[in-house]
Amino acid sequence: MDEEEDNLSLLTALLEENESALDCNSEENNFLTRENGEPDAFDELFDADGDGESYTEEADDGETGETRDEKENLATLFGDMEDLTDEEEVPASQSTENRVLPAPAPRREKTNEELQEELRNLQEQMKALQEQLKVTTIKQTASPARLQKSPVEKSPRPPLKERRVQRIQESTCFSAELDVPALPRTKRVARTPKASPPDPKSSSSRMTSAPSQPLQTISRNKPSGITRGQIVGTPGSSGETTQPICVEAFSGLRLRRPRVSSTEMNKKMTGRKLIRLSQIKEKMAREKLEEIDWVTFGVILKKVTPQSVNSGKTFSIWKLNDLRDLTQCVSLFLFGEVHKALWKTEQGTVVGILNANPMKPKDGSEEVCLSIDHPQKVLIMGEALDLGTCKAKKKNGEPCTQTVNLRDCEYCQYHVQAQYKKLSAKRADLQSTFSGGRIPKKFARRGTSLKERLCQDGFYYGGVSSASYAASIAAAVAPKKKIQTTLSNLVVKGTNLIIQETRQKLGIPQKSLSCSEEFKELMDLPTCGARNLKQHLAKATASGIMGSPKPAIKSISASALLKQQKQRMLEMRRRKSEEIQKRFLQSSSEVESPAVPSSSRQPPAQPPRTGSEFPRLEGAPATMTPKLGRGVLEGDDVLFYDESPPPRPKLSALAEAKKLAAITKLRAKGQVLTKTNPNSIKKKQKDPQDILEVKERVEKNTMFSSQAEDELEPARKKRREQLAYLESEEFQKILKAKSKHTGILKEAEAEMQERYFEPLVKKEQMEEKMRNIREVKCRVVTCKTCAYTHFKLLETCVSEQHEYHWHDGVKRFFKCPCGNRSISLDRLPNKHCSNCGLYKWERDGMLKEKTGPKIGGETLLPRGEEHAKFLNSLK
C-alpha cells in the first residue's frame, strides 16, 4: 500500500506540473525518489532539462562547479535530442508529447485504479524513451572520431548561451573568449532558433524580448548555418575591395589608405611654400632654401641598405621622386634618431618633407642630396597608387624592373620606343609592293652598291626596312612596258564580261535556250501573257535578234573613242542644218509672186533683204551656238506684250507694183521720201474697244474695293490665329519635343567616337612621351686604347684585345636649325652638322616633332633665298 500511495502522489505531482508549467521541473525533482533514497532513472532527464532552461535564460557562469560526468551527460542528452529531431521528426514529436502529457488532467474524483493504470502507461513510455536514449549514446560515442576528421561537414554548434550572448554583446574580449577551443561547452550542441535570411532583425528582437522562452519551443527550430567568423570576415573583405581613392591636392598624387585629412593638410601648409621635387635643383641654384619655409612631397622609389659610418653610426638613404620625371631622383639621407624612427617606412610610401637641408653630392655627380635633422619633419601620408613597374618583358623573358607612373603609361621609355619602332617597321613593310628579303636576280645590276648588298640580308635602319628598300630598287630597275590605256584597262571587269571574252576568243557558239515541257504548256494557254510573249518572240526573230551572233565588243583607246564621238556630233549637226535648209526652201517656194504684167515689167528698185536669203553651207557645217532672235527676219517687229495687235497683212503682188509706181512718180516730181528710224519704238495703235474694256475694269475695281476688304478680313483673322498658335506654348512644346532614344543615340555615338579615337589617343600619348624624353640611360663601352665611347665595341678592339670596360651612359638628343638631328653620349656633340656645317645644336626629344603645313607668311621670302656667301653684303 505504501508503494501505491507513492505512485499516486507522483501522478498528482505530474498533473500539477502540467497546470503550472513554470514550476514543473523543481517539483519533479522533489517527488521522483525511491524508497531507499537513491535518485530515480528519470531524475537525470528532468535535471538536464532544468539545467538547459536556466542555461538558456541566464548568462552567468554559476554552473562551473558541476562535475565533468554531469557535463558529458548533459551534452549527450542534448546531442541525442538534436539527432532525434533531425533524423526522426515523428518519434521526436511523440517523445515531446509524452513528456508534456497530452492527456487531459484528471480530476480528483477518479478512483485509485484509474490513477494506477495511467501511472503504468507513463512508466512504460518513459522506459521506451530511456532505451532510445541509450541507443543514441552508443552511436554518439563512436562518432567523435568521425566528427574530428570532417569538421566542415558536421561541425559542433556553439551552445545556446554563447549564441545568445554573441547576439546581444559585441565586445571583442568576449568574442575572443568564445573562440577558445579548450572550453568543454563547445562540444555541446545547442538548439538555436531558425535564422530566416530575409528578416534577421525579427529573430534577434524575438530572442531579446523573450529571454525566458522554454527550451522545447527552441528545439523545434533549425539552427542557422552562419558563424561569427564568417560574419566578421565578410565586411572586412568587402571593405578592402571598396577602398576610397584619394588625390592629394598639394602633391597631386593618388593615395591608397591616406593617413592625413585634407583639412589638416591645409592647416599644415598655411604660410609655407610648395616646391616640386623635380624643381629643387633649379631652386637651389637661384634661391637660398635655408631662408624659406618650404615643403616638398615625394614617393620612396628605393631604399638603400643601411650603411655604417667610420664612427659606427648607421644611416639610410631614400631615393625620392614625384613620378613626373622618373630619370631624376633625389636622395634623402637619414642619420641618427631620424634613421631609428623612420627606417621601417616601406617602399612606395608618399612622404612630405619640411625644410630639408641640402647636401653636397659626390664628385662628378649632379644628383640632389637632402637630409633632415628631426623625424617630425617627415610626414607619412599614405601609399602611392600610381607607382608600379613596367609590364613589358626583357629579351631574356624576365619581367622589366623599371619604375613607371601607372597614371601616365604602364610601360617604360625603352619599351615604348621599341614598340614605336616595331609599328613603324610594320607600316613600311605594308607600304612596299615586294615583301621578299632579297632583290630578285633578274633585277640585280652589275655594279651593286654596298647599301644594296646589305639590304639583301634584311635589316631595319633609319625608319626604312630592307624589304621596302629592295622593292624601291626593283621598281626603279624594272623596265617599264608601255601599255595603251583603254577603257577596259581603267574599269574593273566583271565575271560575265570575262567569261564572254574568253568564249569569243575560243570561238564557242552561244548556247540556244531549250524550252521545257511545262513552259510549252504555259505558252499554249490562251492568256494575255503568253500572247504578248509570242508576239515579242516573233518580232525578235523577224528583226534577226534571236539566234544571230552579237557583234564582238572591241576595246579601243580613249583618243579613238573621243574621235568617234566628235565625228558623230559633226554628222548630227550636218543633218540638222540640212533639215533646216529644206524647211526654209519649202516655206519660200509657197510665197512665190505671180507673173507681173508686161506693162509693169520693171527691175526692182531695192535688192532683196538679206534676212530672206538662207546661208548656204559651203563645206563646214552650221554651228549650233546660241543666238538672240533666231528665226526673226530683218525689219520684223518684236513685241513682248500679249495684247499686241496682229501683224499687218502683206501686200499682194499687184498692190506692191502699184506702190512702186507711186514712189517713182513722187521721185520724178522731186519729192524726197524720209526713211523711218529703225530704232524708234513703234507705238501700238489704240483700239477703241480696248479703251472701253479698261474703263469697265476700273469701274468694277472701285465698286468692289469695299467688298474686297470685307472678304479679306476673315483671311487676316485666320492668319493672326495661326501666328498666335505658332507662338503658343503648346506649339513650342511640340517643336522642342525630342525622341526618348536620344540618350541611347548619344551614348552610341560617344562609344563609336571613343572606339575611333582611343588608338589615336594612345599613339599621340606615346609620341608626346617620346618627344618629352630628352635623354635615355644606356649601356656604353669605352676603349681606353682607341679613346672612344660608343654603344658597341669595334671588332678590331676585340681582336687586338684592347683595354675597354662597359659602364652606364646617357644618350642625349640634339637638333640643328636646318632640321638635321644627332645623338651624343657627351654634353654636346663633338662635330659640326653634316648638312649645313654649322655648330648650333639644341636639345631635342627622342622623337622628331611633327610639323604641319606652313602658311604663306612662313614660306614667303621677299628678298629671295639668302645664301651664305652673300650674307651681310649690304653692310
UniProtKB/Swiss-Prot annotation:
<feature type="compositionally biased region" description="Acidic residues">
    <location>
        <begin position="38"/>
        <end position="64"/>
    </location>
</feature>
<keyword id="KW-0832">Ubl conjugation</keyword>
<keyword id="KW-0175">Coiled coil</keyword>
<protein>
    <recommendedName>
        <fullName>Protein MCM10 homolog</fullName>
    </recommendedName>
</protein>
<dbReference type="GO" id="GO:0006974">
    <property type="term" value="P:DNA damage response"/>
</dbReference>
<dbReference type="GO" id="GO:0043596">
    <property type="term" value="C:nuclear replication fork"/>
</dbReference>
<dbReference type="Pfam" id="PF22379">
    <property type="entry name" value="MCM10_OB"/>
</dbReference>
<keyword id="KW-1017">Isopeptide bond</keyword>
<keyword id="KW-0597">Phosphoprotein</keyword>
<feature type="modified residue" description="Phosphoserine">
    <location>
        <position position="93"/>
    </location>
</feature>
<dbReference type="GO" id="GO:0008283">
    <property type="term" value="P:cell population proliferation"/>
</dbReference>
<dbReference type="GO" id="GO:0003688">
    <property type="term" value="F:DNA replication origin binding"/>
</dbReference>
<feature type="modified residue" description="Phosphoserine">
    <location>
        <position position="644"/>
    </location>
</feature>
<dbReference type="InterPro" id="IPR012340">
    <property type="entry name" value="NA-bd_OB-fold"/>
</dbReference>
<feature type="compositionally biased region" description="Polar residues">
    <location>
        <begin position="206"/>
        <end position="224"/>
    </location>
</feature>
<feature type="region of interest" description="Zinc finger-like 3">
    <location>
        <begin position="816"/>
        <end position="836"/>
    </location>
</feature>
<comment type="subunit">
    <text>Self-associates. Interacts with ORC2. May interact with MCM2 and MCM6. Interacts with the DNA polymerase alpha subunit POLA1. Interacts with RECQL4; this interaction regulates RECQL4 unwinding activity. Interacts with WDHD1.</text>
</comment>
<keyword id="KW-0238">DNA-binding</keyword>
<dbReference type="InterPro" id="IPR055065">
    <property type="entry name" value="MCM10_OB"/>
</dbReference>
<feature type="cross-link" description="Glycyl lysine isopeptide (Lys-Gly) (interchain with G-Cter in SUMO2)">
    <location>
        <position position="762"/>
    </location>
</feature>
<keyword id="KW-0235">DNA replication</keyword>
<feature type="cross-link" description="Glycyl lysine isopeptide (Lys-Gly) (interchain with G-Cter in SUMO2)">
    <location>
        <position position="763"/>
    </location>
</feature>
<dbReference type="Pfam" id="PF09329">
    <property type="entry name" value="zf-primase"/>
</dbReference>
<dbReference type="GO" id="GO:0006270">
    <property type="term" value="P:DNA replication initiation"/>
</dbReference>
<feature type="region of interest" description="Disordered">
    <location>
        <begin position="31"/>
        <end position="120"/>
    </location>
</feature>
<keyword id="KW-0863">Zinc-finger</keyword>
<keyword id="KW-0227">DNA damage</keyword>
<dbReference type="InterPro" id="IPR056791">
    <property type="entry name" value="Znf_Mcm10_C"/>
</dbReference>
<feature type="region of interest" description="Disordered">
    <location>
        <begin position="567"/>
        <end position="630"/>
    </location>
</feature>
<feature type="region of interest" description="N-terminal domain">
    <location>
        <begin position="1"/>
        <end position="156"/>
    </location>
</feature>
<feature type="cross-link" description="Glycyl lysine isopeptide (Lys-Gly) (interchain with G-Cter in SUMO2)">
    <location>
        <position position="493"/>
    </location>
</feature>
<feature type="compositionally biased region" description="Low complexity">
    <location>
        <begin position="587"/>
        <end position="603"/>
    </location>
</feature>
<dbReference type="GO" id="GO:0008270">
    <property type="term" value="F:zinc ion binding"/>
</dbReference>
<feature type="coiled-coil region">
    <location>
        <begin position="104"/>
        <end position="142"/>
    </location>
</feature>
<dbReference type="GO" id="GO:0005654">
    <property type="term" value="C:nucleoplasm"/>
</dbReference>
<comment type="function">
    <text>Acts as a replication initiation factor that brings together the MCM2-7 helicase and the DNA polymerase alpha/primase complex in order to initiate DNA replication. Additionally, plays a role in preventing DNA damage during replication. Key effector of the RBBP6 and ZBTB38-mediated regulation of DNA-replication and common fragile sites stability; acts as a direct target of transcriptional repression by ZBTB38.</text>
</comment>
<feature type="cross-link" description="Glycyl lysine isopeptide (Lys-Gly) (interchain with G-Cter in SUMO2)">
    <location>
        <position position="627"/>
    </location>
</feature>
<dbReference type="Pfam" id="PF09332">
    <property type="entry name" value="Mcm10"/>
</dbReference>
<dbReference type="GO" id="GO:0005730">
    <property type="term" value="C:nucleolus"/>
</dbReference>
<feature type="compositionally biased region" description="Basic and acidic residues">
    <location>
        <begin position="106"/>
        <end position="120"/>
    </location>
</feature>
<dbReference type="InterPro" id="IPR015408">
    <property type="entry name" value="Znf_Mcm10/DnaG"/>
</dbReference>
<keyword id="KW-0479">Metal-binding</keyword>
